[in-house]
């Protein structure tokens, strides 16, 4: 009979700084002379970028380990028959990265329990855990943001002035926003659009890629806005977004973009970076 191994965890989602406590359960039908039972804990950021096609296709890869530990649970020797539990615990780094899966980058945390048996297939069990930023590490108080389109010192043309109630947000929250349109003159603004844009940057060896996605978008009809008077609205943040992070070979960030669709002219755009996490 094959040796059987499993990993018991109270949950699979954790915050940075959390202690992960569980047990490896080993079941053997007879004595096993093993080289040891151990638990590998790995957190890894990796990037993969491909160039070309067919025979000319080249794939570049880079990776950086956030953590890499081996926890010995049983020394080399004879493991008696029956069911045995081996408890373990480790702490996710306070300054670790959140779990992430994107177009060219990913951050994965995994634990692997292994009974190393010479001249016989090892008993192996893999489990993935999901890591999120601890809320207190992201925001302890609100930091209001003010920004303009173009040069704030230029008083000669149309301009949009934007006020936000903060620069760090969580999924499912609402971004409080207030805009003021200034000096439109004879320009005809057809609409005001607001876009929350997420962007991934990844580097693998000598290759780089940037991927952007519109997370949410809304339009404000000009009939609702008066020039020179503040207009207040809210931008919803979806629940299933990726978390902002900055790693060794990749990062993910957000941009709030507010634009004026001006007839017969280039759009007037004001934008600012935001930190958003799950």
Q: Where do the language-model regions lie?
A:
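C-terminal beta-sandwich interaction modules and adjacent acidic
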Residues: 1-278
